[in-house]
């Protein structure tokens, strides 16, 4: 922790989680003055242990990847997803993105967030950010007292001794997590997704069996739909030999379940409810946990729980401020997208602030760049997750009111001709198009495996199984595969991944997509935004 808190910061970052620490790292490396105010003292507990492969290239850009790789976190070779009990699970293989299934070479990891997050925060300090823990921001002050359209200029915060102080700043980055001080207290623009109002409960187990131990899939997380269609379970191995096991169900089902227990004169504890729901994931409970022990099972706090409501906002930036991480938006954790979205938003916030300071573009254009990048990334993952829930609940999810039309256009522009069957697509997004997009995206989790991919490639030719082949329509896949159902599954999975897997490239992918004539400039020392030539 830094020793002396200055009265003014060029850039104030509120929150030291992955979003805040990553943004602070990049800006400090560029030579800007950065102060981070973190409400808690690290290390601190946090859920969200499963990472996407994109996290590694993001961390490589900030220089933190070797610290994470050498820490000993559990390598994540892929992920298994089981939607239906009478069908095999699907498996996403990350091996092609890594140089080996060891922590140092892994494409992704399962992490303990208390350790992962602290490494990133200390890295920000090493690069020059001034970090102050146990300093909680309480209020923001705006120029001309204009909250709705004004510019935040200072923050009031509490110190460890309880003293209230203030700090002024030129730029504000709100990385305050779900509390989201800008969005909830001042902009008042947080909008919850009515379809994804879920609750989560979880605990940690010892002595659990693993998914395919001794194989190339060893340590892969396993995700399983509950048999009653109310949600899903996660099973995530960690490097301390424990396993994180959680249940996500929709709030309505959870409330009804507890009300029924109350009417029957039964008090349903968090632990009893968790164990009862776990039985609805027979592979996780019956196969992996059959001889396992719940950590602290005699403690009333052995089961943790949290609301799992997905939300977004109508904007994530403004005059000299940016919103990132959970302070900006949050989406259901099925796709393990939390840290990915945090780092992506942190990157674009840092780039837009750098561009504004260096005057390579106006503050307005810079803010809008960040705003649209966050919205596009959120929309992509939203449609993937909604496609998953459409399968889990076995029903159409009418989400037209949940999706911003402009964000959909930007996020899925390459899919619209494929989905609608013509290059001359309409400009207005329809409910039918959203349903087809969700159906397209759900094939990301088709029940295939690497051996099936290899066999289909041998039959149809490896070029058809290449991710570089243009996205195909359903009719094109039908013509190619005929009655070969295995090939149909493989091609549909590959097809769906083309719209999502480019994001695994981290900063390079973010830099490749232009917004209103601007792209990221990833050159260290000149980091920011530049015009597309």
From Swiss-Prot:
GO molecular function: flavin-dependent halogenase activity; monooxygenase activity
Annotated keywords: FAD, Flavoprotein, Monooxygenase, Oxidoreductase
Gene Ontology BP terms: secondary metabolite biosynthetic process
Catalytic activity of the protein: melleolide F + FADH2 + chloride + O2 = 6'-chloromelleolide F + FAD + 2 H2O + H(+); melleolide F + bromide + FADH2 + O2 = 6'-bromomelleolide F + FAD + 2 H2O
Keyword RNA-binding: no
SUPFAM superfamilies: FAD/NAD(P)-binding domain (SSF51905)
Function, as annotated: Flavin-dependent halogenase involved in the biosynthesis of melleolides, a range of antifungal and phytotoxic polyketide derivatives composed of an orsellinic acid (OA) moiety esterified to various sesquiterpene alcohols. The halogenase catalyzes the transfer of a single chlorine atom to the melleolide backbone, resulting in a 6'-chloromelleolide product. The enzyme acts on free substrate and does not depend on carrier-protein-dependent acceptor molecules. Can also catalyze the transfer of a single bromine atom to the melleolide backbone in vitro.
Name this protein carries in UniProt: Flavin-dependent halogenase armH4
Originating species: Armillaria mellea
Lineage summary: Eukaryota, Fungi, Dikarya, Basidiomycota, Agaricomycotina
Gene field: armH4
């Amino acid at each position: 922790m830094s020793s002396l808190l200055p009265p003014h910061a060029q850039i104030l970052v509120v929150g030291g989680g992955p979003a805040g620490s990553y943004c602070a790292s990049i800006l400090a490396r560029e030579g800007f003055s950065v102060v981070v105010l973190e409400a808690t003292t690290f290390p601190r507990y946090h859920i969200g242990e499963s990472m996407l492969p994109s996290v590694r290239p993001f961390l490589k850009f900030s220089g933190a990847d070797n610290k994470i790789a050498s820490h000993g976190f559990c390598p994540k070779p892929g992920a298994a997803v089981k939607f239906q009990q009478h069908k095999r699970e699907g498996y996403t293989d990350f091996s092609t993105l890594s140089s080996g299934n060891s922590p140092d070479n892994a494409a992704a990891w399962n992490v303990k967030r208390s350790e992962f997050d602290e490494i990133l925060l200390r890295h920000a300090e090493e690069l020059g950010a001034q970090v102050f823990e146990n300093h909680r921001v309480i209020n923001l002050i705006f120029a001309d007292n204009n909250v709705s359209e004004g510019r935040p200029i200072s923050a009031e915060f509490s110190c460890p001794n309880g003293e209230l102080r203030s700090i002024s700043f030129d730029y504000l980055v709100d990385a305050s997590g779900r509390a989201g001080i800008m969005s909830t207290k001042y902009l008042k623009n947080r909008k919850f997704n009515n379809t994804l109002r879920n609750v989560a409960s979880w605990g940690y187990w010892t002595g659990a069996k693993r998914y395919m131990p001794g194989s190339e899939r060893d340590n892969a997380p396993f995700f399983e739909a509950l048999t009653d269609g109310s949600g899903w379970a996660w099973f995530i191995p960690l490097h301390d030999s424990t396993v994180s096991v959680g249940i996500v169900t929709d709030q309505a089902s959870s409330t009804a379940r507890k009300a029924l227990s109350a009417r029957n004169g039964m008090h349903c504890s968090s632990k009893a409810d968790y164990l009862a729901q776990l039985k609805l994931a027979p592979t996780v409970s019956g196969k992996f946990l059959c001889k396992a022990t719940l950590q602290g099972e005699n403690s009333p706090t052995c089961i943790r729980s949290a609301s799992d409501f997905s939300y977004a906002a109508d904007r994530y930036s403004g005059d000299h401020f940016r919103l990132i991480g959970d302070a900006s938006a949050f989406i259901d954790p099925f796709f393990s997208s939390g840290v990915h979205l945090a780092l992506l938003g942190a990157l674009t916030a840092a780039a837009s602030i750098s561009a504004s300071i260096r005057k390579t573009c106006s503050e307005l254009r810079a803010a809008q760049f960040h705003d649209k990048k966050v919205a596009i990334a959120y929309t992509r993952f939203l449609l993937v997750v909604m496609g998953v829930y459409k399968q889990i609940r076995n029903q159409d999810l009418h989400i037209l009111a949940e999706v911003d039309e402009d964000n959909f256009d930007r996020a899925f522009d390459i899919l619209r001709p494929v989905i609608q069957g013509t290059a001359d697509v309409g400009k207005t997004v329809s409910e039918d198009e959203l349903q087809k997009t969700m159906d397209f995206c759900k094939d990301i989790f088709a029940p295939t495996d690497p051996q099936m991919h290899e066999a289909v490639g041998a039959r149809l030719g490896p070029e058809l199984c290449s991710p570089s082949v243009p996205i195909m329509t359903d009719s094109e896949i039908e013509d190619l595969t005929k009655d070969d159902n295995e090939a149909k599954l493989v091609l549909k999975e590959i097809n769906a991944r083309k719209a999502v897997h480019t994001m695994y490239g981290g900063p390079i992918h973010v830099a490749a997509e232009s917004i209103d004539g601007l792209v990221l400039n990833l050159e260290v020392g000149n980091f920011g935004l530049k015009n597309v030539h």
